[in-house]
Structures are given as C-alpha cells and as structure tokens.
Amino acid sequence: MHYPEPISKLIDSFMKLPGIGPKTAQRLAFHTLDMKEDDVVQFAKALVDVKRELTYCSVCGHITENDPCYICEDKQRDRSVICVVEDDKDVIAMEKMREYKGLYHVLHGSISPMDGIGPEDINIPTLIDRLKDEEVKELILAMNPNLEGESTAMYISRLVKPIGIKVTRLAQGLSVGGDLEYADEVTLSKAIAGRTEM
C-alpha cells in the first residue's frame, strides 16, 4: 500500500517499538492523525524529554534524572546486598513489593549467543568492578526464568564465587519462560524470601 511519506515515516517509526508490527503501527499512525495537534505535540515532547532528561545511574545502571539514582543515594538501604536484574522494569517490579531493602544492579539485557549478545555487551563488567569496591556480602541474581536468564545467572555466579561473595537465586514460583516484570508482588515476595544459594 502506498501512503503519503509522513504516514510511511510514522508507521516505520512505530514499528521500531517492541511488539509493534505493521498493522498495529498503521493503526497508531492513523490514530495520530485523528488526535488534536496539542496532544501530538505533547506526545512528541514526552518522547524527546525521556531521551534528553533521563540517564543511567553510574553506580547501578537504573534509569534516573539525577546521578546517582535515588536508590543508590538512599542511606537507609542495606548496602551489603545487591539484587541483579535484567532491566529497569524489574527494579520497578521489585520496588512495588516494598520488602526488598538492598541495592540493585541493572544489566540492560541478558546473555544470548543466538542474538549475538555476550557478557561484554551487557552491564556485567561494571558489576564486577562494583563488587571489588563495595562491602557486598550477598548478590541476589534475579534474572528472568528463561534460557537467557539462566545462562546469565550461571555466568555471573561463576565470576563472583572466587571473590567470596554469597550468590543466591530467587526461589522458584516464578514461571519458567516468564518475565519478572509481570510477576505479582506476592510471588516476588515469596521468591525473594525463598532464594537459594548458587
């Protein structure tokens, strides 16, 4: 189908988002045409602002407006425990349960040889540097319970064991193949309480 160039560009832009295929992108593009101009401008500004005003915490890798982030700055946090997660949505899911009081480290992905993603492509080197500099006693590996998450957890566990830090994994109860961000607070709470040493 031939569209006017601005619509084609908008459809292509929407298709860059995860889970958005050609039909959904087309629907979103045409919906944008029906929106009030002020709403479109506000939407476009929100997209630009999120890129300009947010950064990643230099300590843990979590999204933040200020560096370091509010979690790393919180002196009430237990600095002897770091929970390693795959992405920012996992930090948000863990924080919702309001039980975990330690720090975080966001990897921004998981090891996936099939996708050409190795350990050096995610935030593992900064984790190892951090463990050498801080008084960490326990590392909780909270990767998603899928093949990539398990591979990443095993890799980190092997790297960290020689340093002498206790390495634990969230307890089962999280469904295999599922994502941490979709788990409810009760499931996450039980998983953190029943974590096991690796």
Curated annotation (Swiss-Prot):
The molecular function GO annotations come to: DNA binding; zinc ion binding
Q: Which residues belong to any copy of the Toprim domain?
A: 80-175
Q: Which PROSITE patterns match?
A: RECR, TOPRIM
At the top level of its lineage, which domain of life is listed? Bacteria
Q: Where are the zinc fingers (C4-type)?
A: 57-72
> Which keywords belong to this entry?
DNA damage, DNA recombination, DNA repair, Metal-binding, Zinc, Zinc-finger
Q: Known Gene3D superfamilies for this protein? A: 3.30.60.80, 3.40.1360.10, 6.10.250.240, RecR Domain 1
Note the InterPro entries from the entry: DNA_Rcmb_RecR, Hlx-hairpin-Hlx_DNA-bd_motif, Rcmb_RecR, Rcmb_RecR_Znf, TOPRIM_dom, TOPRIM_RecR
Task: Provide the coiled-coil residue spans.
Answer: none
Q: Which GO terms describe its biological process?
A: DNA recombination; DNA repair
Q: Which family does it belong to?
A: Belongs to the RecR family.
> What does the function comment of this entry state?
May play a role in DNA repair. It seems to be involved in an RecBC-independent recombinational process of DNA repair. It may act with RecF and RecO.
UniProt-recorded name of the protein = Recombination protein RecR
Question: What is the protein's species of origin?
Answer: Staphylococcus haemolyticus (strain JCSC1435)
